[in-house]
Amino acid sequence: AADIGASAWWLELDGHRLLMDAGVHPKHEGREGLPLLDLVKDTELDAIALTHCHHDHVGGLPVAIRHHRRAHVLMTELSYFLIERVLHNSVNVMQRQREESGIRDYPLYTHDELDEIAPLFQGYKYNREIPWAFQKSRSDAASPTLEFFDAGHALGSAGILVRGKRETLFYTGDVCFRAQTLLKGARFEDVKADVLIMETTRGNRAVPPTFSREAELARLIEAIRETLKRKGSVLIPTFALGRTQEILAALALATRAGKLKHQPIYIGGLGRVFTEIYDLEAHRAHRLHSNLQLHEALNLIVLEKGQAEIMKLTGGRIFVITAGMMSEHTAAHDLAARMMGDERHGIFFVGYADPDTPGGHLKASIPGEPFLFSPSTGQ
């Protein structure tokens, strides 16, 4: 594929069928953002296996299940704690997009539909071999199996090793091999497979030999200090699941070390929910600083709807808020639009921003020259 989004892989093995992931494309709207699920809607499916709970991997799941109500949905136990919250939030977002942008396809599914399919969801521990051929009628042979391996990307993320009678396949999903602030790196050392499907956003870019995560975090903390010193506010656009918690952990450790003052940090409502789950499930995850409880270490305040457009930005505030790519009608987009042009403030990117998104436009902009941030804000 030329870009990321709408991840979905249909696998036929030993007379059985497995769908791995069912995402939506972040740059396409309505049904155009879905995988080509209509191609297989009349074909029997044994199971669906999920790598992790980001929308580009699970956002189309209810639509996939609509034609395959007998298929069980397999995921890690940590993803099991997240999946319903992610999908219910997706309904809320789609309903708002229908109202604000007139996208008639939205919502692609409803809250009631999610409640109906929730009993299909099953969570498993890492490194456990799981039979998945629930439809026994096609073959008397033993069921193929799958096993989840920690991918180190976000809470609950996994690579999926599928074993058949003669062949094995490994699908990584999104993977992070280096330890982050909280999560340890991927644990793929024991994987042996005949076929590898590997997703990577930056696979053709080598990591500079001088790169150091510790040095980058130190630069970020120092930049935050300098911004607050000049009475500006700090915006760190993040995704609610994963990057938000990693950045909050870095801020908590910097505060504990005396590098930052203890002060309110503004996050989104969904970010708060996922942060609570990170805290509650710390003992189940393969993570560093397992005793670090983010809600106890930081003074987290949920930014209410519409507050980003009106609250005062002077005096030094820290926002760790969605959306990571500053999509329109999000708090990060609205805050950035207000901060740009005021040299006191600082906007710091800590992850990928697609070049065609407002975040990508801002990253590519040249200081002092006009640029189009988004259609709603203009230059």
What is each stretch, according to the model?
Residues 1-43, 123-184, 310-312, 318, ...:
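Core dinuclear metal-dependent hydrolase active-site scaffold
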Residues 6, 10-71, 75-117, 121, ...:
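Pre-active-site segment of Zn-dependent metallo-hydrolases
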Residues 20-22, 45-54, 61, 73-76, ...:
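Active-site neighborhood of phospho(di)ester-bond hydrolases with catalytic His/Asp-centered motifs
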Residues 87-154, 283-315:
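Metallo-beta-lactamase
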Residues 40-43, 67-68, 188-192, 260, ...:
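Short, conserved loop/helix-junction motifs that constitute active-site signature segments
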Residues 220-360, 371-373:
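Hard-cation-handling environments
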Residues 200-217, 236, 379:
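Glycine-rich phosphate-binding "P-loop"
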Residues 152-157, 166-194, 199-201, 205-209, ...:
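Active-site-proximal loop/helix segments of hydrolase catalytic cores
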